[in-house]
Amino acid sequence: MSQQTEPATPLLSRSMSAVIIAQFFSAFGDNALLFATLALIKQLVYPDWSQPFLQMGFVAAYIVLAPFVGQIADSFAKGRVMMFANTLKLAGALLICVGGNPFLGYTLVGIGAAAYSPAKYGILGEITRGDQLVKANGLMEASTIAAILTGSVAGGVLADWNIYAALSICAVAYGVALGANMLIPHLNAARPGQPWHPVQMASSFFSACRVLWRDGDARLSLIGTSMFWGAGVTLRFLLVLWVPHALGITDNATPTLLNAMVAVGIVLGAGGAARLVTLDNVRRCLPAGFLIGVVVVIFTLQHNLLSAYSLLILLGALGGFFIVPLNALLQERGKASVGAGNAIAVQNLGENGAMLLMLGLYSLVVKLGVSVIAIGIGFGVLFALAIALLWASLILTKRRARSAGAK
């Protein structure tokens, strides 16, 4: 008796296409708005030390809301959660456009982004099947990086022309993302009916943290992704000091273009991971993580712009190959235990905590007068050693499990 198999759903289904379009314009708005708002506060003669507070408010929203946004993503249809989050982003952009406090407006965008993140990743596990999840993550990361590239450039260029035109374009981008969210078919909530008491939600969140930490695969993903994004933000600031020191170039464009090369590489690496890595062999990404640290050391010693561009593309490619499978792994493990939304919320807490920690350490060594070359070498060596230790611990754990099974 022959069995009929259900035809496979294409990767770029209506739902997936809507999610990717919404993600691109939402991330485009986030990045363009940052640079447009920086230009605005300069025009309004805010002190220079106030500029980092834009990003701090944005990141702080992720950390403060981490215990709650995962449950929000799992308690409602994720497409509707994404729509609500983009509405908050649109409100923040409009607040800045009409002359409201830019720090308050961008923090409101951060609140929207914090609510958006668990839903945008969690929905991938609901609209794809099996190994399509890794490919879907590759599309999501590629869309995000493309938005970072185009949004950052657009925000800066448009702000030089007209700041309020730049801010208006950001609001339009959020509006387009909101429209794309409306095209996502209604999906059932993953975990409806959970209690809405802040203390219980916080307790549930930290319980999810413990559950994921005890899961070896989830722990690998949490550590790896937190290290990657913490290092990525630190590298962005490192480049600003490295360019004039190593290349003798003092303009503002060169560090931006070098950062863009990393983003281009991440897109390439994400595509490679989608083709070569599955959930069954996800640890294949670890050598790429180790090589990130090695390439940072080699890059720091360069004095040629062309070699710098080439190495940063390679660095980004290694990063994309490293991060995409780890994201997919956490979604899979989280979906099976605490819910994909809660898993991504825990991941956001780890990543943003790592960003604050690494930037704090970076600021400290700069203040102590350590040279940028020494910082770059030390940064690369420490990152490579950390990944090597993580890799070694996984190998030892696997060997112990085999030994126990043999007995």
UniProtKB/Swiss-Prot annotation:
Membrane topology: Multi-pass membrane protein
Similarity section: Belongs to the major facilitator superfamily. LplT (TC 2.A.1.42) family.
InterPro entries, sorted: LysoPLipid__transptr_LplT, MFS, MFS_trans_sf
A Pfam family that the UniProt record links to this protein: MFS_1
Keyword Cell membrane set for record: yes
GO molecular function annotations of the record: lysophospholipid:sodium symporter activity
Name used for this protein in its record: Lysophospholipid transporter LplT
Domain of life: Bacteria
NCBIfam families reported in the protein's UniProt record: PRK11195.1
Main location, first listed in the record: membrane
Gene Ontology CC: plasma membrane
Subcellular location(s) per record: Cell inner membrane
Signal peptide extent: none
Alphabetical UniProt keywords: Cell inner membrane, Cell membrane, Lipid transport, Membrane, Transmembrane, Transmembrane helix, Transport
Transmembrane segment boundaries: 18-38, 53-73, 91-111, 139-159, 163-183, 223-243, 253-273, 286-306, 310-330, 350-370, 372-392
Gene designation per UniProt: lplT
Function: Catalyzes the facilitated diffusion of 2-acyl-glycero-3-phosphoethanolamine (2-acyl-GPE) into the cell.
